[in-house]
Amino acid sequence: MKQYLELMRLVRTQGISKVDRTNTGTLSIFGHQMRFNLSHGFPLITTKRCHLRSIIYELLWFLNGDTNINYLRKHHVTIWDEWINEKGDLGPIYGRQWRAWGTADGSYIDQLSDVMLQLKHNPDSRRIIVSAWNVGEIKQMALAPCHVLFQFYVANGVLSCQLYQRSCDMFLGLPFNISSYALLIHMVAQQCDLQLGEFIWTGGDIHLYRNHLKQTDLQLKRNPRPLPQLIIKRRPASLFQYQFDDFYLSGYDPHPAIKAQVAV
C-alpha cells in the first residue's frame, strides 16, 4: 500500500502544526485522494500488523444498526471503549444513521437497504449514497462521524465506491477505515453479483497526532509487502446476515505491530 505510505510521508514532512479537540496537537494537511484497485488484493496495510478481527466485528456491528458497545465487548473488541457512557451506548452513530435515519414525521430510513435495492434494480443511479452526517443528531453522538458519506458506482458490471472522510487519524484510524470499506465493497459486490472495482478514499483534515510521530517514523522505514486476498466463504441471504467466520484472509504477512495511544 504505497499510497498510504506516500500520504503518511506527505503529512509528516509538509503537515501544518495545529491544535485539536483532544489537545494532543497534530501535523495536518487538507484534501487528498487515494485509489485502491480491489482486484489487485485486499488493502490491509503490511508495514505494521493491523487487527482485521476488530475491523470485521465493527463493520458487522454497524450493519446491524447497533450503537451499544455490548456486542463489541462480547467479541473482545475495544476500539470504541474510550467514548462510551455508563450504559455502554454511543448515541446515534454510524449504525443508527446507516440503518435508521430519523425523519421529521417520526419514521426511519434504512439507507443501506435502499442502496442495495438501487444497486440491483437501478445501478446507473447517481444517488446510491449513504450518509452518517445527521446534523440534527451530532450533539447526541459520543463522537461525530469521521467517515461521513460514501457513494457506490457501477460500470460494466464492476462495483466501485468513494468515501469522503472529514477527519482522518493517519496512524491509527485510516488503516481501519480503508480495510473496513474494502470489506463492505466485497460484501456488496457478492450480494449484487458484481465484480470488484476501486475503492476511492477522499480525505479532508488528514493528520498525524504528535504522540504518534515516533511510530510514524518507524513505519516509514519499512517496505510494504504483497497484499493479502480476502475470501468470503459463503453467500448469506442478505448483506445483513454475514458472520465473522464467513471471512478468511489469505497471504497476510505484515511487519510487527506498532503500538500507539489513541487521542480522545
Swiss-Prot record:
The keyword Flavoprotein does not apply. GO terms for molecular function: thymidylate synthase activity. Keywords: Cytoplasm, Methyltransferase, Nucleotide biosynthesis, Transferase. The active site is at 146 (nucleophile). GO terms for cellular component: cytosol. Its EC number is 2.1.1.45. GO terms for biological process: dTMP biosynthetic process; dTTP biosynthetic process; methylation. It is an enzyme of class 2 (transferase). Pathway: Pyrimidine metabolism; dTTP biosynthesis. DUMP binds at residues 21, 126-127, 166-169, 177, 207-209. The keyword Methyltransferase applies. Its main location: cytoplasm. It is found in: Cytoplasm. (6R)-5,10-methylene-5,6,7,8-tetrahydrofolate binds at residues 51, 169, 263. It catalyses: dUMP + (6R)-5,10-methylene-5,6,7,8-tetrahydrofolate = 7,8-dihydrofolate + dTMP. HAMAP family: Thymidy_synth_bact (MF_00008). PANTHER family: THYMIDYLATE SYNTHASE, THYMIDYLATE SYNTHASE 1. Belongs to the thymidylate synthase family. Bacterial-type ThyA subfamily. Catalyzes the reductive methylation of 2'-deoxyuridine-5'-monophosphate (dUMP) to 2'-deoxythymidine-5'-monophosphate (dTMP) while utilizing 5,10-methylenetetrahydrofolate (mTHF) as the methyl donor and reductant in the reaction, yielding dihydrofolate (DHF) as a by-product. This enzymatic reaction provides an intracellular de novo source of dTMP, an essential precursor for DNA biosynthesis. This is Thymidylate synthase. It comes from Baumannia cicadellinicola subsp. Homalodisca coagulata.
